[in-house]
Structure formats: C-alpha cells, structure tokens
C-alpha cells in the first residue's frame, strides 16, 4: 500500500525506479549483501535517473564463535561485527553527498571516516553493553550516485565563487543551468534514499543515516511524512538550518529544517546547542507559534553558570518533545575540539558527555525513536580524530533506537 501511495505522488520514472529497487531487494532472503553491478538510465525532463540492477553476494552468516573482546577482523563490517544485513536489527545508510557545502568540504567522506573509526570502538558500551548483539550493518552508497555527485561539484563551486565576487548578481542567467543540474542531482539521490529507507523499514529494521552534509536527511522526513505519523525532531547543531535557501540552493544544508517543516506531521522541532543563525531564521522561530523550540547554547551555558543543572535543562528538552521522536545530530553541535574538521565549526557547543546524557534522557523517557541521522563528520587530512568521535556518537545512537 505504501508504494501505491508513493507512486501517485511522484512521476512515473521516479516511481518505476523505486519499484525496481524494491523488487531487486525482495530477493535478498538468505543472508546476502547487495552489490551494485550495472545501471540503466532513463530520461526525466532531459536529465537522468539512475536505475540500479542489483546482484547478490552471499555472506558468511554470523557465527557463535565471534569474540567481542578481540580486535576487529580484516573484512568485517562496521564496528568489526560479522553480522549480515538479514541478521542485523540496525541498518546504517551512508550518504556521500555535500553539494552545497559552503565552507570546508570533506563531509562526503564522513561515512568512510566513521566506518574506519568504528574499528577502534570497544563493543561493551557503558550504558548499552549488549547493543552489538542486536547487529549493526552498514549499507552501501551507489557508486553511480557518488560519480554523479562528484561531477556536479565544479558547478557548485563555480556558483559559490560567483556569489563571492558578485558575478552572479550581474549575470544570473549564466548560472541557471548549473542550479538546475544540482537540483536534479539532489532529486535523483533523494529518490534512491527514500526507496532505500522504505525497503529497510519494510523489513522491520531500525534505520539511521550517516552523512554527508546536513542536506541529506530530507528523504527520511519525506518517508515519515507519507506514513502520516505525527512526530517531533530533536535537532543538535551549531546552526538553526532554517534558511529558505542559501546561496541559491533549494536543498542547502542550511535549509534542511526549513524544508522539513513543510511536512505537516512534524509536530515540533526542538533545537539544542544553537549558536549561529541569521535574522530570517530568528524571525521564523519567533513566529512559529511554538512549533520550533530552541535551547540556545549561550542560554544553556548562562543557566548552568548560575546554578542550573544540565539534568534540569535536559528534562525541559525532553518534555518539549512529543512521544515519537526523530533525532538529527550535526556533529558541529559539539565543541569544535571534538570535530575540528567539520564543515562549519563554531566556538562553544556541547561536551561529548553532555550529548550522551541528553540522548540517554530521551531513551529513559520511554519516547519512541523513529530514526536518526549523524551528519557533517569530516575527516582531517592527517587525523582520524573526527571519524573516531563520530563512530562513538553513532554507536550511542544505535544504543537508544
């Protein structure tokens, strides 16, 4: 029923793409891993939509002999786990995408950095020591979409440079095709990601996204929007991400929650650690009639300096959320010492343990966590620190879902 509803809301080619993807994965019944083998292209408004034809590679099933105390074995999955997609309860979908990054690039390689960092994470989590037993499996981002992304980076950089030197104001028509190509690229990636989320959800999996920049979670909310399930969002970030557009990009990382708020069943957006925003965003917050609630970083710090506890603030944050919650974590919500190479670092922010405490309070509240994303992790040129921290945040998110 879900697919018929979705087909009626989108174009024929997009619907066919999603249907083919669903059918291809429907054969993955016996402990298999999906590998992209070839693609077929079809026209959509003179652009292309990637249609994947999948082959299935049998994996060795998870064995009772797995030693969670040992070092990660060569060729193992995320966190060194040997489980298959079928065995795993939690699926992580990597999204290698950063077309609108406006400061430091590198988040496109965030999923790989987190995967590598996960090999250094001991599996006995302090709060959720058995989370590894649930099984965590990391999906694959299609090579064809990564190639599409990389092919559009020059257009993105040309637009951003033209904005900086004023050329785009004098000759806007020169950049219309670039904007259109980037928007079409987003739509192709979004179609794949919606189908992927829908597939794993139909299999009863818990699903988390791993970006990439913060533009990437929009399809998750579009999927939730089609379920007509009312929910709220806990958004941890240095930035409000409520701009109508940024640098002319409709799907900018700075516009993710402006776009998400168009989805009617999003009851409330609760933002934490915010410390960088524009006048337009502040006005939207003030005029939201309580739909957007912000716990600004400076206000949180002031209250704590004056004797308020982090526990009390976290209780207020949790109480602001409805019973069903989606969690969106931009790594730059943390102090930059924990994510020095992220796309747009801002002084201040949460300590690592403050974030862990807040996430635990969500879990303890009994609220249902529908899904999550972790975005904006960016590896340093000669450092694995960002990936190490990101892997630990991701592991904790797996513990609370």
Tell me the role of every PLM-derived stretch.
Residues 1-11, 18-21, 32, 36-38, ...:
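Hydrophobic alpha-helical signal peptides and transmembrane signal-/tail-anchor segments
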Residues 4, 8-11, 28, 204, ...:
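Residue-level detector of alpha-helix boundary/anchor positions
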Residues 17-18, 33, 219, 280:
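Residue-level recognition of conserved structural "scaffold" positions that shape functional pockets
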Residues 25, 42-43, 48:
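Positively charged N-terminal leader segments that act as targeting/secretion signals
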Residues 30-33, 104:
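Intrinsically disordered, low-complexity, charge-rich segments with an acidic bias
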Residues 46-61:
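Short, Lys/Arg-enriched N-terminal segments with co-localized hydrophobic residues
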Residues 59, 63-401:
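Conserved alpha-helical scaffold segments that buttress catalytic/binding sites
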